[in-house]
Amino acid sequence: MRIPNPTLKDIAAEVGVSISTVSRALADHPAIPQKTKQRVLKAAQKLNYRPNAQARALRNSKTNTIGLVIPNLFNPYFAELAAAVQNAAIDAGLYTLLGISNDDPKGLIQAVEIMQHQRVDGIIAVPHIGTEKELTALAKQNVPLVLVDRELDIVPATSVSTDPAEGIKAAVSMLVTGGHESIGYLAGPQDTSTGVDRLEAFRSACGSFGIDQYPMLLGGYVEEQGYVGTQELLKLGVSAIIAGDSMMTVGALRACHEHRLTPGFDIALVGFDDFPVFQLQNPPLTIINQHVSTMGAKAFEELHKLLRGDSAQHKIKLPTTLIVRGSTPPKDSASDSPGQGGH
């Protein structure tokens, strides 16, 4: 009859050795003979023994758990980021405790406090303006900390984010070369480093092509802001739109659909982040790709270095690339659609 929750004592009784011998055998202690270790492991497997992670953490002062704080899970970008971090952690034999900040400074601070109470070994967080003081204090307590996706320059911690300049410049270049003179931009929130950096990259790209007038709408990283912003840009008569975020891209698609405009025929549209839903559009959407899975894996790699004693701080910027598909034809060919809004 199988014991419901076997303990070290049960294994010791099964093998006929002391509890301390079982404990050291499971820890692969060099003083325990290999034959005894094999007997203990066989008994543990037979009894379906599972070590108590909390008890082991109290002994070792480590929980083998990292914390990950992201704004939300409904944005596929953050869902993919979380999956990448967790998969990398699993490969390293670590657990991941997930916290949701709801893109609110108080939510981020609360999530970090909970993780500290749970004694996580280190934290990866998507930061928010208004949390500089708390994150700086965390870093100064020598808590291994990596900021991902966004930066807070005054926080003394490693950060992993993307440089939007290359991808956005390639998008503007493609549109200008294709004859688009009125390019609208859906800008993200200016209280995030990503929103600021992407807007600056767009302005710089336009300037490099001699464009000093460009329609632009500021909004949040939510579908509704992309929807409303696209409606306003369409009123201004733009022939092309670049969305500064994945959720804003979804909103832009919804607005185009309601106006019976098909990206690739009636208007050129460049989205952000390469998610399957954008590839399934007809025609598929041209995308500025951040390679989010690579970013998540890199963030964990940097945290893992800190957990192993590397105290060096790094500011890592990963490149963005443009994936050209059917939603951004030259201006003249876009006007040759088989019928306004006929798709």
What are these model-predicted stretches?
Residues 8, 40, 85, 111, ...:
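Aromatic/hydrophobic pocket-lining residues that form π-stacking "cages" and hydrophobic walls in ligand
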Residues 14, 19-24, 58-74, 174, ...:
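Short beta-strand segments enriched in small/hydrophobic residues
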Residues 38, 47-114, 118-122, 200-203:
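Amphipathic helical "hinge" segments at domain boundaries
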Residues 1-3, 46, 87-92, 140-147, ...:
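Bacterial carbohydrate/catabolite-sensing allosteric modules
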Residues 2, 46-52, 106, 126-128, ...:
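Short gly/ser/thr-rich secondary-structure transition/capping motifs
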